[in-house]
């Protein structure tokens, strides 16, 4: 992913921060090795659709990332000979990481929480926005602890 976003420090730093939070939350929540692996790969690749979205739509909006990201990630993960079932789940997570009313697993929940922890800080969100996101989105004990401590 660093090669993929070479020369774009904002993009690289974003996915590395999301990965760090996702790994921390996943470990603290006791995820098993397989789910933690999926979560970590999804965290590193969750915004892989931004590049093609900006080229095709002149936008990095979440809806475009969800449309364009899975195919790019699938090709990358296949090239790396990553497990097929895990690739399918990672691509699902990439294709839904801006959809908050369909969270269907702990990997999805943690990915969303980790992405919000980073986005809320990067966007200098208001206290009201942070509180609203915390109340509507955050479910894990570790994620709630982090959002309370960070903000």
Region locations from a protein language model:
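His-Asp-centered metal-binding catalytic motifs of divalent-metal-dependent phosphohydrolases/nucleases
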Residues: 36-58, 69, 91-98, 115
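Mid-chain, well-packed structural core segment of small domains
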Residues: 76-80, 84, 88-96
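An active-site-proximal "capping" alpha-helix that borders the catalytic cofactor pocket
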Residues: 18-21, 63-79
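Short, conserved alpha-helical segments within structured domains
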Residues: 14, 37-40, 86-90, 110
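Divalent metal-dependent phosphate-bond-processing catalytic cores, especially two-metal-ion Mg2+/Mn2+ enzymes
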Residues: 6-16, 20-32, 45, 82, ...
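Active-site flanking loop/helix segments enriched in acidic
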Residues: 1-17, 49-59
